[in-house]
From Swiss-Prot:
GO molecular function: ATP binding; guanylate kinase activity
GO cellular component: cytosol
Record-given protein name: Guanylate kinase
Main localization of the protein described in the UniProt heading: cytoplasm
The UniProt record lists the keyword RNA-binding: no
Organism of provenance: Mannheimia succiniciproducens (strain KCTC 0769BP / MBEL55E)
EC number from the UniProt entry: 2.7.4.8
Underlying gene: gmk
Function: Essential for recycling GMP and indirectly, cGMP.
Domain annotation Guanylate kinase-like: ranges: 4-185
Length: 208
C-alpha cells in the first residue's frame, strides 16, 4: 500500500479554506482523505463536538502530551489556549494510504516543514482585501472590532504566501475547488509516487 500524502492548507479567515476542504471531502467517495482534528484546551463553542471539530482536553492533559512528544506541532495562542496536531494519528492514517490535511496557520506550517520536509503546502488567497472584508461582514457573526482584527491578522497571514508550494486564488469557488483537486492529482503523478505504486510494472517493462 502506498503512503498517503501530508498537506498543509493555510489562508486568512474568510478566504474560503474551510468550505473548500468540506467540498473536497464530499467528493471523496473512496474515503482516501481526511482533515486532522486538532487538540485544544479552549472550551467548546455551541455546536462543536468532541472528536469531530476538536479534541477538547485540559491544560494538564495537553502538557502531558507535549512531554510525551505526541504533537507534530503545537502553539499557545492569544488568550492562553493550546492548539496541537497529533503525530500518532497522522502517522497511522498516512501509513494506511490516506491523504491527511492540516488546517493550520503559517507558524504551524513552519514547524511542520522542519519535521516533515516532504509535506506539501497550499495557500488560499482571496481575490482582494475588499472581497475578504465583504465575506467576513457577510457571515454576520462578528462585531466591527473583531472584523478589523481579523483583517489585520489576514494581512500578516497573506505576507507568508510565498513560503508555500501552491497558491490558489479563490475568486470563483468552483474553479478554486478544481485547482485544489488538480494539485492533489498531480502529486499522485510524481516520479517517486508512481515508482512506488507501479514498481512491479516498471520492473516488467525493463526486464530483458
Amino acid at each position: 500500500m502506498s503512503q498517503g500524502n501530508l498537506y498543509i492548507l493555510s489562508a486568512p479567515s474568510g478566504a474560503g479554506k474551510s468550505s473548500l476542504i468540506s467540498a473536497l471531502l464530499e467528493q471523496d467517495q473512496a474515503n482516501t482523505m481526511m482533515v486532522s482534528v486538532s487538540h485544544t484546551t479552549r472550551q467548546p463553542r455551541p455546536g462543536e463536538e468532541n472528536g469531530v471539530h476538536y479534541h477538547f482536553v485540559s491544560v494538564e492533559e495537553f502538557e502531558l502530551l507535549i512531554n510525551e512528544g505526541a504533537f507534530l506541532e503545537y502553539a499557545k495562542v492569544f488568550g492562553g489556549n493550546y492548539y496541537g496536531t497529533s503525530l500518532p494519528t497522522i502517522e497511522k492514517n498516512l501509513a494506511q494510504g490516506i491523504d491527511v490535511f492540516l488546517d493550520i496557520d503559517w507558524q504551524g506550517a513552519q514547524q511542520i516543514r522542519k519535521k516533515v520536509p516532504s509535506v506539501k503546502s497550499i495557500f488560499i488567497l482571496p481575490p482582494s482585501l475588499a472581497e475578504l472584508e465583504k465575506r467576513l461582514i457577510g457571515r454576520g457573526q462578528d462585531s466591527a472590532e473583531v472584523i478589523a482584527d481579523r483583517m489585520s491578522k489576514a494581512m500578516d497571514e497573506i505576507s507568508h504566501y510565498n513560503e508555500y508550494d501552491y497558491v490558489i486564488i479563490n475568486d470563483d469557488f468552483t474553479r478554486a475547488l478544481a485547482d485544489l483537486v488538480h494539485i492533489l492529482r498531480a502529486e499522485k503523478l510524481t516520479l517517486a509516487y508512481q515508482t512506488e505504486q507501479n514498481q512491479a510494472l516498471i520492473n516488467q517493462l525493463l526486464a530483458k
